[in-house]
Curated annotation (Swiss-Prot):
Lineage of the organism: Eukaryota, Viridiplantae, Streptophyta, Embryophyta, Tracheophyta
Binding site for ATP: 190-200
Cellular-component GO terms for this entry: chloroplast
GO BP terms, alphabetized: isopentenyl diphosphate biosynthetic process, methylerythritol 4-phosphate pathway; terpenoid biosynthetic process
Keywords annotated in UniProt: ATP-binding, Chloroplast, Isoprene biosynthesis, Kinase, Nucleotide-binding, Plastid, Transferase, Transit peptide
Family statement: Belongs to the GHMP kinase family. IspE subfamily.
One Gene Ontology MF term: ATP binding
Pathway: Isoprenoid biosynthesis; isopentenyl diphosphate biosynthesis via DXP pathway; isopentenyl diphosphate from 1-deoxy-D-xylulose 5-phosphate: step 3/6
Protein name: 4-diphosphocytidyl-2-C-methyl-D-erythritol kinase, chloroplastic
Gene3D superfamilies referenced in this protein's UniProt entry, alphabetically: 3.30.230.10, GHMP kinase, C-terminal domain (3.30.70.890)
Length: 405
């Protein structure tokens, strides 16, 4: 197996998803003092309820021949009692743990339409969420002043440079809440890939913080706030497919323009493409002149093909990482009958082959591409008021050529 630190994942302890009914039911044969450490916030105390309120089942029994009186049998129904208490915990104690999928995106096309006075560039792009993603586990910290942040890969910043931390700080600033979290980031999306993995993490953190706070902000609020810390973050508050303009923060939801079962393969060499370097080498007089709305219409009517997958950042990215140009050319040549289109996502360095989940055979041959990252993926979307779900039918685990048989 290749020794790339970004793709060797350590085993870690997973937080069990919390289900209060099963938690309480596990104590069916136990005694009440085992609940004594549970002190939920709110107007009432569940411990008092445990001690004072009881649920009984009253059953009529046959008359006693010795007394001639009818008897009543009183049965204490512990299981029913605990189920009702569990429901009250869910209502009054709120969420304590939450695990969310944090998917990445690709740019099906990316036009750069001009440079702004603030130094940023205007773009027009079809963004789409795909099924490769990270998992983030949030646990509510008992402290109102600090939390913790760990991840399974080296090199990921664990301080305020990380977009997750920036997002949570932003949420506290905007809402006045004081909740902090223990966070475990299970990273599968490579960094420096043009896939928006960090932006997705930030959007997921904002969503999680809002859930822990009783959804005090709207999705529109979260989307608008997120633009303050990253241009790509607002997109993830769309439903998964969007036409994005401005710096990327102007997001227009569109109906999914491509089938969600359309397969693709993502291939990324070890070299990253620093976004700043790519934009420095961008020459606007050498970009495409095709109207991005024409590209969007063509995709909506005819699907993905090579002629619509325009990316104005490819030429400068190929200058920054020359081997990336060769990789794209080889994939396109080898996969003429395999892929509908081959293109770079974002500012690189991921090359996307749409139409097949398999990489071309040459990546298995020799040592040149022994450390390449590749993963299959599909297009996904989300429903209103729900976060993205990890598809169950697709294996998005990153792979290495030398791992194949």
């Amino acid at each position: 197996m290749a020794s790339s630190s970004h793709f060797l994942y350590s085993h870690h302890h997973s937080y069990a998803s919390y289900n209060s009914k099963s938690h309480f039911n596990s104590f069916t044969n136990a005694t009440f003092p085992q609940f004594s450490s549970f002190k939920p916030n709110g107007s009432s105390s569940f411990r008092k309820k445990l001690q004072s309120s009881r649920i009984h089942i009253i059953r009529a029994a046959a008359s006693d021949p010795t007394t001639g009186r009818n008897q009543l049998e009183v049965v204490y129904d512990l299981e029913n009692k605990l189920n009702k208490l569990a429901d009250e915990v869910d209502r009054e104690a709120g969420i304590s743990r939450l695990t969310l999928f944090s998917p990445c995106k690709i740019n099906v096309f990316l036009r750069i339409t001009g440079k702004r006075e603030d130094g940023f560039h205007d773009l027009a792009s079809l963004f789409h969420v795909i099924s490769l993603g990270d998992k983030i586990k949030f646990s509510l910290s008992p402290s109102k002043f600090n939390g913790s942040f760990v991840t399974n890969v080296p090199g990921v910043p664990l301080d305020e440079k990380n977009l997750i931390i920036k997002a949570l700080n932003l949420f506290r600033k905007k809402t006045g809440t004081d909740k902090h979290f223990w966070i475990h980031l299970d990273k599968k999306v490579p960094t420096g890939a043009g896939l928006g993995g960090g932006s997705s993490n930030a959007a997921t953190a904002l969503w999680a913080a809002n859930q822990f706070s009783g959804c005090i902000a709207t999705e529109k609020d979260l989307q608008e706030w997120s633009g303050e810390i990253g241009s790509d973050i607002p997109f993830f508050f769309s439903h998964g497919a969007a036409y994005c303009t401005g710096r990327g923060e102007v997001v227009e939801d569109i109906p999914p323009p491509v089938p969600r079962d359309l397969s693709m393969v993502l291939m990324k060499p070890q070299e990253a493409c620093p976004t700043g370097e790519v934009y420095k080498r961008l020459r606007l007089d050498q970009t495409s002149d095709i109207d991005p709305l024409v590209l969007l219409e063509k995709i909506s009517k005819g699907g993905i093909s090579q002629d619509v997958c325009v990316n104005d950042l490819e030429p400068p990215a190929f200058e920054v990482v020359p081997s990336l140009k060769r990789l794209k050319q080889r994939i396109a040549a080898a996969g003429r009958s395999q892929y509908d289109a081959v293109f770079m996502s974002g500012s690189g360095s991921t090359i996307v082959g749409v139409g097949s989940p398999d990489p071309p055979q040459f990546v298995y041959d020799g040592d040149e591409y022994k450390n390449i990252f590749f993963s299959e993926a599909k297009f996904i979307t989300r429903s209103a008021n729900q976060w993205y779900s990890e598809p169950l039918s697709t294996d998005e685990s990153p792979s290495f050529p030398q791992d194949a048989e």
